[in-house]
Amino acid sequence: MAIYERIGKGYDLTRRADPYIVSRLNHYLKVRANLSYLDVACGTGNYTLALSQSGGTWHGIDQSPRMIGAARKKSDAIFWQLADVTRLPYRERAFSGVVCTLAIHYFIPLSSAFNEIYRVMAAGNFVLFTSTPEQMNGYWLAEYFPEALHQAAEQMPSLEVVNDALSGAGFHSMQTENYSVQEDLQDLFLYSGKHRPAMYMDAAVRAGISTFSLLASTTEIEDGCGKLDSDIKTGRIKDVIRKYEHDEGDYKLIIARKDAT
């Protein structure tokens, strides 16, 4: 995840905790005031801060010094740590819940990360917000940035792979909830412009999205933006968006349980 050193600068210009996503994470975490919680791959701490408003003692870890540095400037009420998810600096059963948003595709191997998260959890839920390759293949962005979207989808572990790694670590009772991007989404991650295609014409927005800043070539961005701009002006974009409509959600909440031992 040290690759986020490359996009950390200016990250908070377009990335912020979305209230609806926070509400769904809270729903499954079931935060209690006297317990401790961990945000894994917390980035600049946007979701950590938002979730901490519900109570509890919060910790956030990230592998990027730039991201953790930005998080530390936002709050000294949260315990921020520069750390690798496969070697967490905590004792066993330290946390009553763990959350991770849009980061598990950087956990290599996935099993090592989930084993560590299981180790530091007491009874509680591990709540993930992610997308699957199947969902990403349904993004209309593939019409304009096919190679970058293909690479991004290939990075994502399938739901089957995630569930196998979770059960292998000891978690059980896995459940999922699909999330479809809404027009008022405040966190400008990859498919946040689903209903607002002109958003992708903004270089600042693209800079905060790893698919564009880390995977897409300059030529693909220039060509894709040119085609997208033309389709927005002619109205063809509406037909493109309709072609990619589906009911499988754009992202997914995955919830796994650990019982008291």
Please annotate each region the language model reported.
Residues 38-40, 44-87:
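Class I SAM-dependent methyltransferase SAM/SAH-binding core
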Residues 111-124:
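A short glycine-rich, Lys/Arg-flanked "PGG" loop and its adjoining helix->strand segment in the class I
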Residues 175-261:
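Conserved Class I S-adenosyl-L-methionine
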